[in-house]
From Swiss-Prot:
InterPro entries per UniProt: Snake_toxin-like_sf
Alphabetical UniProt keywords: Disulfide bond, Ion channel impairing toxin, Neurotoxin, Potassium channel impairing toxin, Secreted, Toxin, Voltage-gated potassium channel impairing toxin
Function according to Swiss-Prot or TrEMBL: Blocks voltage-gated potassium channels (Kv). This is the slowly inactivating phase of potassium efflux which is blocked by this toxin.
Stated name of the protein: Dendrotoxin B
Main localization of the protein described in the UniProt heading: secreted
UniProt keyword Ribonucleoprotein, yes or no: no
């Protein structure tokens, strides 16, 4: 489970899921 932010399309572990702009996606597609 990785959080994706609108400002940062790249998966970042530092990004917290606290923001509402967080999406649950699998990194397998990357």
């Amino acid at each position: 489970m990785i959080c994706y932010s609108h400002k940062t399309p790249q998966p970042s572990a530092t990004i917290g899921c606290e923001e509402k702009t967080c999406y649950k996606k699998s990194v397998r597609k990357l």
